[in-house]
Amino acid sequence: GAGGALFAMRRSLYPTIPIDLLDDMIASISPIFSGHRVVSVPDVYAFERATSDSADEFRRKRRIACRAFNTHRFLAPQLRTMGLLNRFKYVSHKYIRWFSAAFLLLWLLFTFIAIVSLAGIVAATVTALAGVLLLVLGLRFNLPLIGTLVEIFMSILATGLGVLEALAGRSYQTWTPAKSRRD
């Protein structure tokens, strides 16, 4: 689906959307279900204010992931009717993002198991502790690469928690735009 900042569509194609779901996602993908095209225009830009607070950004990503996954479940019967190319685009864009936390946890677990099997439990534990220490020191001394890695990890974690909330039956109906430094 299109981003909520800016998209346009024919009024006749605009669907009825439940209040707790992502209207921009449903509205912008619905034309495909009725055989219409969705196009992107490269010379149109939209700007949104971004938050400068990591905690606000974490909550925002978590809320959006919960609503997006609930929206996916709402759209599932129609998604199955899409052609293979559109279904591939949808799955490769959405599923990988939603389940990145699970993939990351599995990667960490299997990496730890591999190190245990190759070098022993002590080496695996030392490697894990060294990784944690590197992250802590990088954040403490404000190393840009470490900060970027932590932000990526937090984004993946927020998305994973949002999906878990959706699977547990949680929904969000209202939201407050994040405050930015410009407010």
What label would you give each PLM region?
Residues 146-166:
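Membrane-cytosol interface motif
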Residues 106-113, 133-136, 163:
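Alpha-helical transmembrane segments of multipass membrane proteins
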Residues 60-125, 145-148, 170-183:
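Basic/Trp-rich segment in TM-proximal cytosolic loops or flexible interdomain/linker regions
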Residues 27, 64, 96-100, 154, ...:
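Hydrophobic side chains within alpha-helical segments
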Residues 119-140:
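A C-terminal functional module that forms or caps the active site or interfaces directly
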Residues 3-16:
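Conserved nucleotide-sugar donor-binding
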Residues 12-13, 45, 95:
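Short, well-ordered alpha-helical scaffold segment located
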Residues 19-90, 161-165:
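Catalytic donor/gating beta->alpha subdomain of glycosyltransferases that bind UDP-sugars
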